[in-house]
Amino acid sequence: VQADVSKTTQAESLFAAALQEFGKVDVLVNNAGVMALSTLNETSDDDFNKQFDVNMKGVFNMLRLASTHLNQGGSIINLSTSVVGLKLERYGVYAATKSAVETMSAILSKELRGKDVAVNCVAPGPTETELFTEGKSQEFIDKLANMSPMERLGQPGDIANVVNFLASDEGHWVNGQVLRANGGIV
């Protein structure tokens, strides 16, 4: 099932389809995201709105649904970015959307008190995905890769392992946290 989670009705349909198919929802991973790089003064209203609609409002829509439908003992994992800590030029709007996600996650972890639902963020550093590499020069990609003490880009599997841990029973005691899976870049 695909949906534009920034649209409330589509987010509701997505959640309803999951409930119908599986009977319950134990884990929500909010991974939808868009990024338009530009300086703040050059950011168009359209780019600003699209990033906030998908990256923040989409997460909000799914969190609102999960807070009422997620099973006791469930987990919510929201994807953020280590750019929130790096404060790189041209990432201002994108980082702002993800900072909002981190704040909502921490607050929701407290609002779900007594439901035994863990809410966390995973904040990847530069990871070799289409979203990261699109529109960037190889020189810039190499520069970011070398900022990490591990001197490489993260791989999708590096991030998936952290998400899997947080979704597992072993990771359930972790709650209200931002895990910066970035090879030490921040």
Residue spans for each PLM region:
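A conserved structural motif in NAD(P)-dependent oxidoreductases
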Residues: 148-159, 170
